[in-house]
Amino acid sequence: MSIKQMPGRVLISLLLSVTGLLSGCASHNENASLLAKKQAQNISQNLPIKSAGYTLVLAQSSGTTVKMTIISEAGTQTTQTPDAFLTSYQRQMCADPTVKLMITEGINYSITINDTRTGNQYQRKLDRTTCGIVKA
């Protein structure tokens, strides 16, 4: 049956259902965006955070993503390579109950290390897959 052949009430019901579904998706994304913004603000209140020769200097949100920028401390010998530090940091974040909850709610994390010694940039994304979170 084509749309032209559908009775008026069925078509209206179908359109209302689709509109409701799309509104639900938009509402979920809006909520996730607000959560990401709040999470970035909470992290920012505690900056800078130093660990193993690296410093977390910036946290900001972009849509449903919390973007965090870490720099290697100039003139300081780091105890880990940037990749090793990111792997360790990823493990810690994925184990954190608050981060797990945020990821379950649709928040993703993007972590960037700017290595001031080499000028290289290293990046990791944290989401359901990278943290091994099964969708409920």
Swiss-Prot record:
GO terms of biological process kind: DNA damage response
Inducing factors: By heat shock (shift from 30 to 45 degrees Celsius) (at protein level).
Locations listed in the record: Cell outer membrane
Pfam families for the chain: T2SSS_2
PROSITE patterns assigned to the protein according to its UniProt record, in alphabetical order: PROKAR_LIPOPROTEIN
Cellular component, GO annotation: cell outer membrane
Signal peptide (residue range): 1-24
Membrane topology note: Lipid-anchor
Keyword Nucleotide-binding included in the entry's annotation: no
Keyword S-adenosyl-L-methionine: no
Positions where lipid (N-palmitoyl cysteine) attaches: C25
InterPro entries: T2SSS_2
Stated family: Belongs to the GspS/AspS pilotin family.
Function description: Involved in a type II secretion system (T2SS, formerly general secretion pathway, GSP) for the export of folded proteins across the outer membrane. In a functional T2SS this subunit helps assemble the outer membrane channel.
Remaining remarks: In many other E.coli strains this gene is part of a type II secretion system, but in MG1655 the locus is missing a number of genes.
Protein name, entry field: Lipoprotein YghG
Source species of the chain: Escherichia coli (strain K12)
